[in-house]
Amino acid sequence: MSRVAIVTGASSGNGLAIATRFLARGDRVAALDLSAETLEETARTHWHAYADKVLRVRADVADEGDVNAAIAATMEQFGAIDVLVNNAGITGNSEAGVLHTTPVEQFDKVMAVNVRGIFLGCRAVLPHMLLQGAGVIVNIASVASLVAFPGRSAYTTSKGAVLQLTKSVAVDYAGSGIRCNAVCPGMIETPMTQWRLDQPELRDQVLARIPQKEIGTAAQVADAVMFLAGEDATYVNGAALVMDGAYTAI
């Protein structure tokens, strides 16, 4: 059955893989991204075969007005919202360091995108899902939701909050036919991580900490999302699907 999915941060990396996977199975997608130009380029290079099934919406996920307008546009275009994938996120300044050297502005920015953005997305779609009596929300968290990343206090804090928000939504709406789960990826090769993985020494350092000795792919993240959004996961609710090559198992 064809569904309507909203994917934030849809123009590259994990978001692109997720949105494309929905489209490939015949679903309609509202693709949200901060840059209208990047969305247009992505549509031209990756989604030309699905032109009638994609709604491109420029939106800042941390802006309530943008998010509400994007949800309204999706309802107007497609008439339903079956799945929300809160994928948009930022890591923050890699030089921010430990907590006492992290600028307040940097902390606020990371929390605004990574936590407020998911809160606003959930808040905007839930009334529609309640009316439908069904819906699925998948939040892209991180292994940093489970273990602290050294020198990344803002990012680690934000991803911990994402996991707790996921559980809160699951508990509050489980009786209404709505499921909410999180995907917790480890190191995934995307444009966001490419600067590190392109440096052989840093790549080796990353691989040394992963028992499986592999870097994950955006396609694998999309696999996890499709499982949680699908009929094989109807009793999975409030869960964290960890995909990290056993990184957090040691």
UniProtKB/Swiss-Prot annotation:
Q: What induces it?
A: By aliphatic and chlorinated alkenes.
**What SUPFAM superfamilies would the database entry show?**
NAD(P)-binding Rossmann-fold domains (SSF51735)
The record places the site described as Transition state stabilizer at S142
Q: Which InterPro entries match?
A: NAD(P)-bd_dom_sf (IPR036291), Sc_DH/Rdtase_CS (IPR020904), SDR_fam (IPR002347), SDR_superfamily_enzyme (IPR051122)
Tell me the pathway: Alkene metabolism; propylene degradation
Effect on the protein upon substituting R196A: Almost loss of activity with the natural substrate 2-KPC, but does not affect activity with 2-butanone as substrate
Give the protein family: Belongs to the short-chain dehydrogenases/reductases (SDR) family.
UniProt: NAD(+) binding residues: S12, G13, N14, D33, D60, V61, N87, I188, E189, T190, P191, M192
Organism, as annotated: Xanthobacter autotrophicus (strain ATCC BAA-1158 / Py2)
Please summarize the record's notes on activators and inhibitors of this protein. Inhibited by the arginine-specific modifiers 2,3-butanedione and phenylglyoxal. 2-(2-methyl-2-hydroxypropylthio)ethanesulfonate (M-HPC), an achiral analog of both R-HPC and S-HPC, and (2S)-2-hydroxypropyl-coenzyme M (S-HPC) are competitive inhibitors. Inhibited (at 70%) by the coenzyme M analog 2-bromoethanesulfonate (BES).
Q: What does this protein do?
A: Involved in aliphatic epoxide carboxylation. Catalyzes the reversible oxidation of (R)-2-hydroxypropyl-coenzyme M (R-HPC) to 2-oxopropyl-coenzyme M (2-KPC). The enzyme is highly specific for the R enantiomers. In vitro can also use achiral 2-propanol and short-chain (R)- and (S)-2-alkanols.
Write down what this protein is called.
2-(R)-hydroxypropyl-CoM dehydrogenase
Q: What else is known?
A: Enantioselectivity is dictated largely by differences in kcat.
The catalysed reaction is: (R)-2-hydroxypropyl-coenzyme M + NAD(+) = 2-oxopropyl-coenzyme M + NADH + H(+)
- Where does the record place the site Lowers pKa of active site Tyr? K159
| CDD domains, per database record | SDR_c
Q: Which domain of life is it from?
A: Bacteria
Subunit architecture: Homodimer in solution. Homotetramer. Component III of the aliphatic epoxide carboxylation complex together with components I, II and IV.
Asked if the record carries the keyword RNA-binding, the reply is: no
